[in-house]
Every structure is written in structure tokens, then in C-alpha cells.
């Protein structure tokens, strides 16, 4: 999705008003994009306030769009204009290779702190020997379930998608019969956006259908196992998942689950602390497990997610901006965010921290899920990844919405990807 140049100019013209000041006026004023709504924004606000008090600088918050697709479009237009309006930006795990030319090298400021973080993420954030972003938190898709409902109906957490469908249908129908007409079996992210790419990569991988392209950049998505995965997911729509799921993002799915109206949910780790919050209807009733396998011969798969923080090379205060990045990605801040917000740390030592594990018991039992998550193929497809992902999520959405069969959609997708690739990614 593209943001018009006129819209960008409007944003740029009013950006000073869009920012909310969080400290007194001193040395430098650093503007940061790091949280859009709710808990995410509040954590961003608190952390930047703390840094401002420690350093005497001023921090202003810019609230980015909620959609990752829209955020990237906005940043790209700001980079094209060489705008200095934003000093620090939040960077999705698949973006570093796409925007590397617009970010400063953080190594002169990190003092080796990156060595504490997961090496694979640091490598992802390194381009041409430059550390262009610091890991902020990592993510991997998880299965949330109502452990009280499973126990009530004599079921266990499913290990395959087939088991999930059967259990979801059984409990959904029973709960509706008992009076909850709004009960759904399974909610997830099926809107046509990057979140659907994440979900669908998990489905493909779990059935042995590979990824959109392989590590060498070869287009592999058009295969029978991938078709099986998408056909299976399409069978959920209107049976165990509401048709409205075709317009669900993460927060839409969480809203249904947290209101007590879903048996299962696919979402990121952040949903744990919110689901167990004071205003949640299902506090203490949530279980978490790895996402199911694609049949008995399949495997568990979780898409790698997560966010980084980086400094724009157009910033007028790179040293101060880098200082803020290093503070926000530090062990002390990551620990606090893990305990209070269930944000997965990118620092391995924190997965052995008692306070972190007490707040998030699944961090220990599902540690392997987080360290072996499946990447989207941004490295293999380079600057063309946004086109690749958009083609994939649109093809998947066509299958889920019944507009095309999995086989036809994947064949068409293969042709589209060949056009995008041409001679090389």
C-alpha cells in the first residue's frame, strides 16, 4: 500500500504537532517512531522519558501507522526527501536490507553491546560490515488457547492443524449450544497485509511446502504441499473461523480472543501479558504452545518477527539518537519490557532470568521456537521483497476468500514472481 506524496507532505508539515514532548528542553531534541497504539506506545513513552531524564535531552514521539506496510511506505518517502524529521525509527526484521543506505553505522556507539544479542539477529541487522540497527525485541508466532475450555470439554492442546480444526469445531459448537452465540473456534491474521504473509509462511512450512523462495532465491512456492497448506487454511473460513477474519490483523484477533469468544488464536508473544491483564475476561485461563504441525509427518513452524531500532543518516543529532537506541535496547530495558509486556528479549541471558520467566513461563518451554523461527525471504529477494510479499499475501487471500483454488492461485503467483524477479532479485 502506498502513501501519496501529498499525504507525506502533510505529515512532514505537521510532524512537530504530531509529536508529544516527553522531557524538558535541553541539549538535543530527538524524534522517534517506536509505538503506534496501546501498550506499545506506553512502553515507548516511558522508556524515552527515562532516557530524557538521564541525559537532559528532549524526546518527541511520532505515532506511526499501525500497518507495517504503511510504516515502510512512509519511511521510504521520508528517506527519498532526505528528511531530518525523524532521528530514530523502528525497523521490522525484514527491512534492514531494503533501507540500509539510509541508516548510520551504530558500531561507533555500541561499545560491543551487540555481542549480548542473538547472533542471527545481529547478522540480519548488519550490512556491508555496518551495524545498521540494534535488536529491540524478537517475535515468533504462537498458538494461544483457552485451557479452561479444553479441560471442560476433555481435550488437549492440538499438535496438528487437523487436531486443531476438530477440537475447535467441537468446543465452538458446544459453547454456542450452551448460549455463547459469539464463540469462534480459531482466530488469526487473514487480512491482505504482511501479517498474512507471516501466517501463511507458517502454514506452508508446517506442511513441508517450503517458503515463497528458497535460500538461493529460486521460486519454490508452487508445489502440492504448499497447495495443501493453503487449502487447509481456507477450510477454516466460515467453519471454525468467522468470515470476518479475512479483515483481521493482530489486534482484531486479540480482541475476539481476549473478550472470551475464541478457543484458539495465532498471535505474537505480546498478547500474553494483555490477555492476562486486569481488564481481560480470560485472565489465568490462557495456555500457549508451539503452532501445530501440518499433519503427522509435518513440523512445527513459527515465522520470525521482531523489531529493531535504527538512526536515520539524515538526523541532525546522530550521537544523541544512537545513545537513545542503545538505552532502549539495553538489558535493563529489555528485561522490564519482557516482564511487563511479554516482549521477547533479543538477549539470551534474559531467558534464564527468574523474574522474566515468572512473568512469561512459556519463554523457557518454547525457547527453541524463538531461536529457530522461520525467516521470511527478505535476504534472498532483497529490495524486491515488498513486491514478493504483497504478491504472496494477495494470492493467499484469494484462496482464503474462495476466489481461487490453491492450485490455481499458486500457479498464478509463480508467474507473477517470475515477472518480479526477471533476471535476478
Across the structure, where does each feature detected by a protein language model lie?
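Short, well-ordered beta-strand elements
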Residues: 28-38, 57-64, 87-88, 132, ...
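Extracytoplasmic "Venus flytrap"
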Residues: 29-46, 64-66, 139, 194, ...
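Extracytoplasmic "Venus flytrap"/periplasmic binding protein-like
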Residues: 31, 47-119, 124-126, 148-159, ...
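Conserved C-terminal helix/tail region of periplasmic/extracytoplasmic solute-binding proteins
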Residues: 53-54, 58, 151, 371-425
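Hinge/lid segment of periplasmic solute-binding proteins
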Residues: 92-140, 156, 181-182, 196-199, ...
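Long, aromatic- and glycine/proline-rich binding clefts that accommodate carbohydrate-like moieties
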Residues: 120-125, 289-290, 339-391, 398, ...
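Extracytoplasmic/periplasmic solute-binding protein
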Residues: 132-136, 141, 165-218, 262
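Glycine-centered hinge/linker elements that transmit conformational signals in sensory
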Residues: 168, 215-246, 291
